[in-house]
Amino acid sequence: MNIKIDKKDDVILKILHYFITEEDYKPIIINGLENEIWLENMQSDLKLIRINTNYIHNEEQLKTDMYKAQSIMRSIKKSTFSFRMNMLNLLLDTGEKVKVMDTKNIETIKVDEISDFKKNKVVKEFFPKVSNAELTDQVDPIEFFKLTEDMNQKTIKNEKKLAKIFSQKKPVITYALIVLNIMVYLFMVLYDVDGTYFYALANNYEFVQNGQIYRLLTSMFLHSDIIHIACNMYALYILGPQVERYYGKTKFLLIYLLSGLLGSIFSCAFMSADTISIGASGAIFGLLGSIAYFTYYYRATLQGLLRSQVVPVILLNLAIGFMVPGIDISGHIGGLIGGILVSMGIGIGDKGRKADQINGIIVFILMTLAMLYMVFVK
């Protein structure tokens, strides 16, 4: 039996296969579109790929098509909380006299043959691997089905990775931190009636400046009363398992401790000499920051979650800190910033661009040094 493959379908499949299997793009479902395929990779310089198979017979129709593409791109940019978004627009069926035009943030090319795609200078600039890709103009039914199977396997592999990240795991480190905080609190209540240990471990500007740096860490495990520890441990019980599941046990512990430490340094930098600061709030705000980074990183998958849920929760908690007396708002802000930067620096699973991780580490170090300068020098 002879199977005939349409030339245009062959070109579409080869382009899709390349972007999905080699460049880690994923399809986007956009309602109301016909003869268009949209792909996304939020870690790429060209975050969107559009493959348009509609026939464009003149430049007026091209302008209308470009306007539609820009409108959809703006909508995706807004829903994914992206500050900058560039797109590659591939036109597979245009009239001979139609001259393509580039618009702001959109690179447009005409593709009649797969060689047009492979040899295009824009494609080679953004996707250097395309030069070595096996992309030929020959239409082969056997290859057609092989490429389809490759894409299916890649999709299954990606789904398994996501399932592993979002699967339920026993939050051992979270429970250990809760137990440790409660044990420290009970010790202080039962055996430190006069507050000797309490004041020896609390965060205080003058004592830290005089060399008692350990206070920046020990103060994270002290709480003033039952309401204070109950609120913090409840927040840790809610947020901790999520972060531990998303990042893994070791990375979760790093996020908790380092963001809490930066929160303590922020607190110390802005407190008066007669003030003490205690509590796990800085570390807990660090967990909020790590969740914010995670939802931003997977913003295409978790559509709208960052904007509709995570950011409002963070803003509400910060607002409470500003309005209620006695709350160490500087520690909360420091912890939040620390959580975002540490999460960025350590990355999520085996994903993440090295440049982002390096930037996260560098900015965290610079932020820490700047706050330490305020504590010890200024």
Predicted segments, located by residue:
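N-terminal pre-first-transmembrane soluble regions of secretory-pathway and organelle membrane proteins
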Residues: 1-52, 108-112
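N-terminal signal-anchor transmembrane helix
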Residues: 40-216, 305, 350-362, 372-378
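N-terminal TM1-TM2 helical hairpin plus the immediately adjacent luminal interfacial "cap"
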Residues: 171-280, 322-327
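Residue-level signature of the transmembrane alpha-helical core
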Residues: 182, 257-261, 283, 288, ...
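Alpha-helical transmembrane segments that form the membrane-embedded catalytic/substrate-binding core
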Residues: 229-236, 278-290, 328-346
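Cytoplasmic-side transmembrane-helix entry/capping segments in multi-pass membrane proteins
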Residues: 250-255, 280-283, 304-311, 357-360
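Structural signal for the C-terminal ends of transmembrane alpha-helices
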Residues: 292-297, 341-350, 376
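Terminal transmembrane helical module of multi-pass membrane proteins
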Residues: 317-348, 361-370
